[in-house]
C-alpha cells in the first residue's frame, strides 16, 4: 500500500488525542490524527471500545500505509451514573435526561486515563482534547505538557460565544426566548434568539457546572485548533485569535485528508449503501442536478415534519439523495413511505439511504448541485469545500450560528425558513415548521436558474477552490500545522 506520509517533520513528537464521544466530534479528530501523523508525529488516540470500532477500518488503512497511529481503550463507566451498557456515544442516548449523566460519566475517565499516560511511551509532547472533555486539563497539568483544545466549531461560532460570555448582561436583558438581540463587537451585523445560541451562555444547575468546567478548561489551555481555513472567515479567525492571545491554529478543512475512495466512503462509519451502487446512481444523473439531503446523525424531527420534507422533495421534480438515519425512531417513516406509495413514486429520481451515508464521497461527485443540511459544522464545511450551495435547516446547538454564516455572511446558501429550535422531547409539540410548499420553494431557489442562484453557485465554487488551496503545501492551513508543530517542538526542547 502506498504511504500516506507527506514528509517527516520531527519523529520525536508524540501527540495524544482525546475525541469526544459524538460522531460530529470524532470524525474530524480522526482526520486531525492522520494529518499530524503525515508530518511524522507519533499519534495515540484514547477512546472507549465502542467508539474505537466506528473508525477502525479508516485507521487500519492509515496504519498499514506507514502512519504511526496507536489506539488505546478505556472502559466507559456506565454503572456509576445509571447509564445502560453500550451507551458510549451521544447518538446512542434515548433521551435528553441521559445527557447530564453521560457528561458526568465521561469525566470519570480521568483516573484510568492518568494510569495510561504514566505508562505511555514515548513520553507525550502534547494533548489535543475535545472541548467537552475538561478532565484532560488536569492530566496535562499533572504531566506538565501543553493541552490544545479542539471544538468542532468554526471561528464564527467561537467568537460569538466568547463575546457573549463577556457580555452576559445582554442575555439577562432579553425579555423572552423568542426575542432577537444583536451580538456586540462582531465583524458582521448578526442577531439571535437565546435558544439559537450554540451553547447555553447562561446555563443553570448541572449544566452550568458542566459548562463552567469546559470554559475554564478552554481558557487555561495552551491554545486552540479549529477545523476551518482563514480564507473562509478571515475577520472571525483574526478576532478569535486575538481573543485567545494568538494561540489559535486553523488547519481545515480536515476532511480533505481523505483522498482514497474507501476512506471517503467509510469516514465516520461503514456506509449503509454500497459505494459502487451509489456512484453508479450519481453517474446516471446530469451535472449539478442532484440535491443531497442529510439532517445529521442526531436528527430529531417529528414524523409529521419528515413527511412534509419528503413530499416537498417529490413535488420539486428534482433528483435527490435523502439520508434517513436507520433507527427504531424512523420505523414509522419507512412504513409511511411504502404504504403511501412515496418510495414507488420517487424511485426513478430519488435514492433513499437508510443509515450512514458516504457523505464526502457523494458531495464530491459532479452530479450533486445542492445540499439540504442541518448545518452541523462538519457538514457545512464539507458542502462548501465541495463547492456546493446549501439549503440550511438548523435543529439545535451551533447549527443556527452556522446558518447565519452561510446565508448572511458568505451568501453561499438559502434558508429553509426554520427559526425555532427543535427541543429534545418536545418535537411533536413543535410539529411542522416547513411544509411541503416551503421545501419545494427552497429547493427551487437554490437549484434554479435565477441570477441569485447563479451568483451563489459562483461564490461557493470559489470558496471550495480556496479550501483546497488552504491544505496544499504553502496554503494557510498547511502552514498553520507547521507553525503548531514548531511551537510544540520549541516547548519540548525548552523543557529538556
UniProtKB/Swiss-Prot annotation:
GO molecular function, a single term: UDP-glycosyltransferase activity
What is stated as this protein's family in its record? Belongs to the UDP-glycosyltransferase family.
InterPro entries recorded: UDP_glucos_trans (IPR002213), UDP_glycos_trans_CS (IPR035595)
Key words of the record? Glycosyltransferase, Transferase
Instruction: Write the protein's name.
Output: UDP-glycosyltransferase 73C3
Q: What is its EC number?
A: 2.4.1.-
Q: Which Pfam families match?
A: UDPGT
Hey, what's the signal peptide range on this chain? none
Decide whether keyword Glycosyltransferase is in the record: yes
Residue positions binding UDP-alpha-D-glucose: 297, 357-359, 374-382, 396-399
Record keyword Electron transport present: no
Amino acid at each position: 500500500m502506498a504511504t500516506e506520509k507527506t514528509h517527516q517533520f520531527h519523529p520525536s513528537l508524540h501527540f495524544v488525542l482525546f475525541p469526544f464521544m459524538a460522531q460530529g466530534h470524532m470524525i474530524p479528530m480522526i482526520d486531525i490524527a492522520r494529518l499530524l501523523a503525515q508530518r511524522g508525529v507519533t499519534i495515540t488516540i484514547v477512546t472507549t471500545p465502542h467508539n474505537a470500532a466506528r473508525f477502525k477500518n479508516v485507521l487500519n488503512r492509515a496504519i498499514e500505509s506507514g502512519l504511526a497511529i496507536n489506539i488505546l481503550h478505556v472502559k466507559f463507566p456506565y454503572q456509576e451514573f445509571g447509564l445502560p451498557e453500550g451507551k458510549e456515544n451521544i447518538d446512542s442516548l434515548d433521551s435528553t435526561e441521559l445527557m447530564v449523566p453521560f457528561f458526568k460519566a465521561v469525566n470519570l475517565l480521568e483516573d484510568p486515563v492518568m494510569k495510561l499516560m504514566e505508562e505511555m511511551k514515548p513520553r507525550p509532547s502534547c494533548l489535543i482534547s475535545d472541548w467537552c472533555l475538561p478532565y484532560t486539563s488536569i492530566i496535562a497539568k499533572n504531566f506538565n505538557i501543553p493541552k490544545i483544545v479542539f471544538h468542532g466549531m468554526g471561528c464564527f461560532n467561537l467568537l460569538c460565544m466568547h463575546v457573549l460570555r463577556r457580555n452576559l448582561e445582554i442575555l439577562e436583558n432579553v425579555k423572552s426566548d423568542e426575542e432577537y438581540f444583536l451580538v456586540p463587537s462582531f465583524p458582521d451585523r448578526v442577531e439571535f434568539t437565546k435558544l439559537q445560541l450554540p451553547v447555553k451562555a447562561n446555563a443553570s444547575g448541572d449544566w452550568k457546572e458542566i459548562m463552567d468546567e469546559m470554559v475554564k478548561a478552554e481558557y487555561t489551555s495552551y491554545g486552540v485548533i479549529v477545523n476551518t481555513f482563514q480564507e473562509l472567515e478571515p475577520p472571525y479567525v483574526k478576532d478569535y485569535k486575538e481573543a485567545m492571545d494568538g494561540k489559535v491554529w486553523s488547519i481545515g478543512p480536515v476532511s480533505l485528508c481523505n483522498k482514497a475512495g474507501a476512506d471517503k466512503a467509510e469516514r465516520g462509519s461503514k456506509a449503509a449503501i454500497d459505494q459502487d451502487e451509489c456512484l453508479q446512481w450519481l453517474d446516471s444523473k446530469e451535472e449539478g442536478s442532484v440535491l443531497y439531503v442529510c439532517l445529521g446523525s442526531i436528527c430529531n424531527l417529528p414524523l409529521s415534519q419528515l413527511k412534509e420534507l419528503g413530499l416537498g422533495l417529490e413535488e420539486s421534480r428534482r433528483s435527490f439523495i435523502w439520508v434517513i438515519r436507520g433507527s427504531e425512531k424512523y420505523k414509522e417513516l419507512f412504513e409511511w413511505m411504502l404504504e403511501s406509495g412515496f418510495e414507488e413514486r420517487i424511485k426513478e429520481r430519488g435514492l433513499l439511504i437508510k443509515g450512514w451515508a458516504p457523505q464526502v464521497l457523494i458531495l464530491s461527485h459532479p452530479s450533486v448541485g445542492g445540499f439540504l443540511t442541518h448545518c452541523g459544522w462538519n457538514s457545512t464545511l464539507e458542502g462548501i469545500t465541495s463547492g456546493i450551495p446549501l439549503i440550511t435547516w438548523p435543529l439545535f446547538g451551533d447549527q443556527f450560528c452556522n446558518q447565519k454564516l452561510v446565508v448572511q455572511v458568505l451568501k453561499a446558501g438559502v434558508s429553509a425558513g426554520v427559526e425555532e429550535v427543535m427541543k429534545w422531547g418536545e418535537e411533536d409539540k413543535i410539529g411542522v415548521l416547513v411544509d411541503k410548499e416551503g421545501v419545494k420553494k427552497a429547493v427551487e431557489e437554490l437549484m434554479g436558474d435565477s441570477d441569485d442562484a447563479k451568483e451563489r453557485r459562483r461564490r461557493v465554487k470559489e470558496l471550495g477552490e480556496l479550501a483546497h488551496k488552504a491544505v496544499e503545501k504553502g496554503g494557510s492551513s498547511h502552514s498553520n500545522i507547521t507553525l503548531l508543530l514548531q511551537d510544540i517542538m520549541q516547548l519540548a526542547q525548552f523543557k529538556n
